Amino acid sequence: MGKYGDLMKVYKFGDIPVGVETRGVYFNDNCINYLAEKAKPEFVIKATDKDLEFEQMQSEDDQTYPKSYLEFIALYRKFCEKAIDYGVILVHGSVLEIDGKAYMFSAPSGTGKSTHAKLWRDCFGDRVTMINDDKPLIKFREDGIYAYGTP
């Protein structure tokens, strides 16, 4: 068992079932809508102390983050690195669905992606469903390109 007591659960992100070993409940609490307990994982990820240290060093400020948050970020980074092998990538953008089709607005931070998506929601009302407003997963398949929400 790890320092906080290992917890292994299966989640589905971008239609990929993945086993996730965690030290605590932060990841599990934030990903509860993605649980896929009966699915067989394609792979298993776990964050080490070294991974947590790396995430802390990557922060853009001098704040010290809780280990539970750093673990969340480290685990998600590991998933995204492996997801490429399954035709899934993480994109910085805002994705919405209208009339059965997804639309993504992608640009540098502060450009107005979320504002633009809000204008669509205001204009088209109930016809619009937000898929993800920051970092959607995009999956490339033979029958098309699919967008998925993320925790």
Report residues per predicted region:
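Hydrophobic positions on the alpha1 helix immediately C-terminal to the Walker A/P-loop
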Residues: 116
